[in-house]
């Protein structure tokens, strides 16, 4: 089982022949999309978050409000029929840049993401998870990286194990380079991509499939560095998309150590790829 998990972790989800072709593609410009480089007045971001867990309302809003990037909106999709939308709108109605929608729980995560993108007003989409941590410079760094590719995000990330208070790094040496996949909670892309690639109608692996489909269409993926984001492992309190126990997951990471405050480790506000508006 461990060998299978290790193979799954390091897999780039693309066969050898396609990898060779992609290496050639990475040296070429994205001329097929004819998307002009952004100028400052054009760069506005639609942050989308899908959740079926009411307890993360505070975290969703804090991640958004923490961002130093000013020109943005937040679209929240509630994907559980038991969730009371009025409990969210009572708080969000005072913020004109935040909109909340409720989608039937029978609909997949991929469906919800596509729904949110259709509602988005701006020309950059940033997919944020409900339970992770996004530092103040997260959006600024991601937006600036769009000059390298039409889809950006992180492959190497910090991981924080809440129960043991352990900070670690996964997928090391996958920073500031073109890659074959990106971590789902860190996907940031130009909205024009949605005309070519959409999320598949499923709730597991929709982010990996999105990356695969981008590659098939000749759309490059660029990974920034690991700073400004932490993947939070909540232990037994939550069911994660990848159902693997913490102790086994730690063996797939580089352990930094036991820390109470991981924020001081992961925030890097002097990033070269910083863009403040």
Which stretches of residues belong to each language-model region?
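Glycine-rich, basic loop-to-helix element that forms the pyrophosphate-binding segment
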Residues: 103-120
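N-proximal low-complexity "stem/linker" segments adjacent to membrane-targeting elements
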Residues: 1-66
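Short beta-strand-to-loop acidic/aromatic patch adjacent to the donor-nucleotide binding site
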Residues: 122-134
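Catalytic beta-strand/loop signature of glycosyltransferases that borders the donor
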Residues: 155, 221-228
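Acidic donor-binding segment of Leloir-type glycosyltransferases
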Residues: 62-102
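Acidic donor-binding loop at a coil-to-helix junction in glycosyltransferase catalytic cores
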Residues: 204-210, 219
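Nucleotide-sugar-dependent glycosyltransferase catalytic core
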Residues: 219, 232-256
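Conserved catalytic core of nucleotide-sugar-dependent glycosyltransferases
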Residues: 128, 136-201
